């Protein structure tokens, strides 16, 4: 197996891409996010580490990411902003520095009720699930998807490398 070396993604370097990201309008349950990929991970299993996805999600004041769910867990760390998430009916109020988890297949949605951009870092096991061909999601509610072929594309192709 290939050796996976440590990686760092500097916020200063990502800031211009986050600025481009927030110019992209939200559609349906869509989200604006950047994928942080370690170049040492295999091309057919790209992620921060094998099987682990690391991303940055940004949404503007007043925006709402519609209810959705997936069979990968999600750990969210709030880097900026204030708001709340509804996870399986439970309201989780968050602000800068907070961390919360969303279990696999838990219905969840996010709200930015603050006055500034909300930035969430999130970790998921979706890369491993996609590699195993068992990644599933439901978004918007009632519309199922299933990852049957490998490969990942950036949310906005202009943000990709």
What are these regions (language model features)?
Residues 1, 111-161:
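Double-stranded beta-helix
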């Amino acid at each position: 197996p290939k050796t996976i070396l440590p990686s760092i993604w500097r916020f200063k370097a990502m800031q211009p891409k986050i600025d481009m990201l927030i110019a992209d309008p939200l559609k349906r349950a869509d989200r604006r996010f950047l994928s942080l990929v370690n170049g040492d991970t295999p091309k057919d299993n790209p992620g921060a580490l094998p099987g682990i996805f690391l991303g940055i999600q940004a949404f503007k004041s007043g925006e709402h990411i519609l209810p959705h769910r997936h069979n990968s867990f999600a750990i969210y760390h709030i880097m900026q902003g204030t708001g709340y998430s509804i996870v399986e009916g439970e309201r989780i109020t968050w602000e800068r520095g907070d961390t919360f988890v969303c279990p696999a297949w838990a219905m969840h949605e996010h709200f930015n009720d603050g006055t500034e951009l909300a930035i969430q870092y999130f970790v998921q096991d979706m890369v491993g699930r996609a590699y195993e061909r068992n990644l599933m999601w439901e978004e918007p509610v009632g519309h199922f998807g299933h990852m049957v072929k490998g490969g990942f594309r950036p949310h906005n192709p202009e943000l990709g490398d």
